[in-house]
Curated annotation (Swiss-Prot):
Secreted recorded as keyword: no
Span list, region Necessary for the translational pausing of its own mRNA: 230-256
Gene: Xbp1
Null mutant phenotype: Mice embryos die at 12.5-13.5 dpc and display less blood vessels. Embryos display hypoplastic livers, cellular necrosis in the myocardium, hypoplasia of the heart and die in utero from severe anemia. Mice display severe abnormalities in the development and function of secretory cells, such as plasma B cells and pancreatic acinar cells. Haploinsufficient mice fed a high-fat diet gain more weight, display enhanced ER stress in adipose tissue, reduced insulin receptor signaling and develop peripheral insulin resistance and type 2 diabetes.
Region Disordered, residue ranges: 35-56
Record's protein name: X-box-binding protein 1
Length: 267
């Protein structure tokens, strides 16, 4: 016997279940048969999918329903485990990528810190060469880390003006090199003067000490030599002159005078 359940209204075009109770199937079960309604057939013909309601399991025994429920629960649990495993592997990969990126950023941050320190030292050296006052540590840009972010503290307006005027200062330094050397000369000139004064004082003290030791000895030697020469000197005796007169053997004044002048007494 065939029982046909018609749709209660035209708006609901859901299929109905027909039970064939004339010939029982093997195992004493009734076979369900799904028959589409008029609108469902039209929708299938048009190609648009139609939402199906949940199938009633009135033809299954309680044991079969429990077995089916167990199978569905197993499938759902396995699906959930697979999804969880895939999600965990994805999160682990993201953690590894983030750790690598964090390590790279830390290295880059360290390099930037070293570069900033080198630039600050170079800036101070340039300011010292130009004769300008060095920047205070508070005016130097600093990198402050707060939490996971990094914030750059800008310097004062003086540092910005210095960066803008750097080319002009380089040109001035090239055009006037003595101005750059002037501070160094001011620092080196007193040192040179002090070194010269100390050398002159040392030289004078050394020469005085040398002459104080040598001069008395030379004076003694000179005095002794003078005394010895005075003792060895022979007193000068004027030549003996004969009186002219008739007692002379001959009267030859010129010849006798020449002989007397050439005569020297023997010692």
């Amino acid at each position: 016997m065939v029982v046909v359940a018609a749709a209660p209204s035209a708006a609901t075009a859901a299929p109905k279940v027909l039970l064939l109770s004339g010939q029982p199937a093997s195992g004493g079960r009734a076979l369900p048969l799904m028959v589409p309604g008029p609108r469902a057939a039209g929708s299938e013909a048009s190609g648009t999918p139609q939402a199906r309601k949940r199938q009633r399991l009135t033809h299954l025994s309680p044991e079969e329903k429990a077995l089916r429920r167990k199978l569905k629960n197993r499938v759902a649990a396995q699906t959930a485990r697979d999804r969880k495993k895939a999600r965990m592997s994805e999160l682990e990969q993201q953690v590894v990528d983030l750790e690598e990126e964090n390590h790279k950023l830390q290295l880059e941050n360290q390099l930037l810190r070293e570069k900033t320190h080198g630039l600050v030292v170079e800036n101070q050296e340039l300011r010292t060469r130009l004769g300008m006052d060095t920047l205070d540590p508070d005016e130097v840009p600093e990198v402050e880390a707060k939490g996971s972010g990094v914030r750059l503290v800008a310097g004062s307006a003086e540092s910005a003006a210095l960066r803008l005027c750097a080319p002009l200062q380089q040109v001035q330094a090239q055009l006037s090199p003595p101005q750059n050397i002037f501070p160094w000369t001011l620092t080196l000139l007193p040192l040179q003067i002090l070194s010269l004064i100390s050398f002159w004082a040392f030289w004078t003290s050394w020469t005085l000490s040398c002459f104080s030791n040598v001069l008395p000895q030379s004076l003694l030697v000179w005095r002794n030599s003078q005394r010895s020469t005075q003792k060895d000197l022979v007193p000068y005796q004027p030549p003996f002159l004969c009186q002219w007169g008739p007692h002379q053997p001959s009267w030859k004044p010129l010849m006798n005078s020449f002989v007397l002048t050439m005569y020297t007494p023997s010692l």
